[in-house]
A protein has these predicted regions:
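Short hydrophobic-aromatic micro-motifs
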Residues: 45-48, 80, 138
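Conserved active-site and cofactor/substrate-binding residues in soluble primary-metabolism enzymes
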Residues: 15, 19, 64, 99, ...
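A glycine-rich, hydrophobic loop/mini-helix early in the fold
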Residues: 60-92
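Active-site loop/lid in soluble adenylation, ligation, and acyl-transfer enzymes
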Residues: 1-56, 60, 72
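Short secondary-structure junctions
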Residues: 6-7, 69, 117-120
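Short, contiguous, pocket-lining structural segments
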Residues: 12, 80, 96, 100
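Catalytic beta-strand/loop module used to bind and position nucleotide/cofactor moieties
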Residues: 86-138
Length: 138
């Protein structure tokens, strides 16, 4: 799996990453590639493709605070990605969905465990959890 280094683009709006995903999925030059990249995003609300935005989002409040709303290509719920939040994309061309999730997310979990062990081992007492929300394009 290839990793795309997008740091040269800096923090972007969600639309940049959604367009990049769509381009990679449809462009002939990427047809056989399996890719991973991290999104460094500006604050936004991101809704899954099947969500009713008006049911998920307090529209009056969102307009008041000026946070943009985006609809992603994949399913899943609605999230608020605040300052410092990052998202990630895995693009795999083959395999059963559950196997792909297990394989890809296990590497993310391993990375978080390493970060926690390296940087936070003396900061926390007790248990803590890291949660990942995922979606897929069928």
């Amino acid at each position: 799996m290839k990793t795309l280094d997008l740091t040269k683009y800096g923090r972007q709006n969600v639309s940049f990453y959604l367009a990049l995903e769509r381009h990679i999925l449809n462009a002939p030059e990427w047809r056989n590639d399996e890719l991973f990249f991290i999104w460094d995003i500006n604050p936004a609300i991101v809704c899954g493709k099947h969500q009713l935005i008006e049911s998920e989002v307090n529209m009056d409040y969102v307009r008041k605070i000026g946070v943009p709303i985006y609809r992603r290509h994949s399913g899943g719920g609605t999230i608020f990605a605040d300052e410092g939040c990052f998202m990630f994309t895995f693009i795999k061309r083959t395999g059963k969905r559950d196997d792909v999730f297990r394989e890809c997310l296990s590497s993310v979990v391993d990375a978080f465990h390493e970060i926690a062990r390296k940087y936070y081992s003396n900061e926390f007492q007790g248990n803590f959890e890291i949660v990942s929300l995922t979606g897929t394009i069928n």
